[in-house]
Swiss-Prot record:
EC class of the enzyme, as a word: oxidoreductase
Record-linked InterPro entries: Various_sel_PB
Pfam (any one): GRDB
Oxidoreductase in keyword set: yes
GO molecular function: glycine reductase activity
Function: In the first step of glycine reductase, the substrate is bound to component PB via a Schiff base intermediate. Then the PB-activated substrate is nucleophilically attacked by the selenol anion of component PA to transform it to a carboxymethylated selenoether and the respective amine. By action of component PC, acetyl phosphate is formed, leaving component PA in its oxidized state. Finally component PA becomes reduced by the thioredoxin system to start a new catalytic cycle of reductive deamination.
Source lineage: Bacteria, Bacillati, Bacillota, Tissierellia, Tissierellales
Protein source organism: Gottschalkia purinilytica
Protein origin, superkingdom: Bacteria
Protein name as it appears in the record: Glycine reductase complex component B subunit gamma
Assembly notes: Heterohexamer of two alpha, two beta and two gamma subunits. Component of the glycine reductase complex, together with components A and C. PB is substrate specific.
Length: 35
């Protein structure tokens, strides 16, 4: 099994911009971000 970890900026994950930079990494199921 291969696991892939992909980091997406907070902006594309609908968390916010620089003011939400303190949010810890999290796991989300399904498509998140652009495209």
């Amino acid at each position: 099994m291969i696991r892939v970890v992909h980091y997406i900026k907070e902006f594309f994950a609908n968390i916010g911009g620089e003011e939400m930079a303190h949010v810890a990494p999290e796991v989300r199921e399904g498509v998140v971000g652009p495209g």
